[in-house]
Swiss-Prot record:
Annotated keywords: Disulfide bond, Knottin, Neurotoxin, Secreted, Signal, Toxin
Species of provenance: Conus ventricosus
Biological classification of the source: Eukaryota, Metazoa, Spiralia, Lophotrochozoa, Mollusca
The protein, known as: Conotoxin VnMEKL-0111
Protein's cellular compartments: Secreted
Propeptide feature ranges: 20-46
Amino acid sequence: MEKLTILLLVAAVLMSTQALIQHDGEKSQKAKMKFLTARTLSAKTRGVDCVGLSSYCGPWNNPPCCSWYTCDYYCKF
């Protein structure tokens, strides 16, 4: 009976961990889509290839781009 309880506890912890990892992946995907949308709109209105990313860099929004190298990578996406 103790082994069953331990196995159920381990399974619950693993399922919780998987749910957290999946949520973080969805969050970063949404941030990337926001970035790509902003970049596209900026390019259409200003005739440039890349939107400035200072507003996207910060721990509050899990940005896809916080360095110019990464910015260049996403802008050439």
